[in-house]
Amino acid sequence: MARGVNKVILVGTCGQDPEVRYLPNGNAVTNLSLATSEQWTDKQTGQKVERTEWHRVSLFGKVAEIAGEYLRKGSQCYIEGKLQTREWEKDGIKRYTTEIIVDMQGTMQLLGGRPQNQQQGGDPYNQGGSNQQPRQQAPRQQRPQQPPAPQQPAQPAADFDSFDDDIPFMDPYRFNWHLQ
């Protein structure tokens, strides 16, 4: 029997550009802040109320590199990971933080298009290098024009009434059920 399930699924918006760093063994670690919001109507006032929750997300390995390269402030993404609480001591006071860990068992998927604050003319995504360097925008390439495809003649709609096959299910009343 399983001892428990530790699984978190979030769909949210990045609150800042991700921070990428590399461990001594060369593995990437990316930290980001993800916002999720819920909305409801207050029964007493009739006003719409919105609450935003901020989540700390740490990604490891290849998914961390991808997040660091493609996610930006305002990007929407799907995160699937696990909760983990860390403890440390600072100035004699124990401190705790709970974060979502996305490692080899987790998932990160980019959603939607480019963030709304990006300009139309350039490529908003980092072309490599570290996050400390300024990002350069690559010139936008246009697709070659293709001639329109010739139109195909319309095909008649399928006639589903002409099927005379029997329904491929067994009749449950044909069998003797021996239940004891």
Swiss-Prot record:
Q: Which PANTHER family would you find in this protein's record? A: SINGLE-STRANDED DNA-BINDING PROTEIN
Locate the compositionally biased regions of type Low complexity.
Answer: 132-144
**GO BP annotations, alphabetical order:** DNA replication
Compositional bias segments (type: Polar residues) = 115-131
CDD domains found in the cross-reference section: SSB_OBF
The record, for Pfam families, names: SSB
The organism is Pseudomonas putida (Arthrobacter siderocapsulatus)
Region of interest: Disordered: 111-180
Q: Which UniProt keywords apply?
A: DNA-binding, Plasmid
Protein name stated in the entry: Single-stranded DNA-binding protein
Residues making up the signal peptide according to the UniProt record: none
Gene that codes for this? ssb
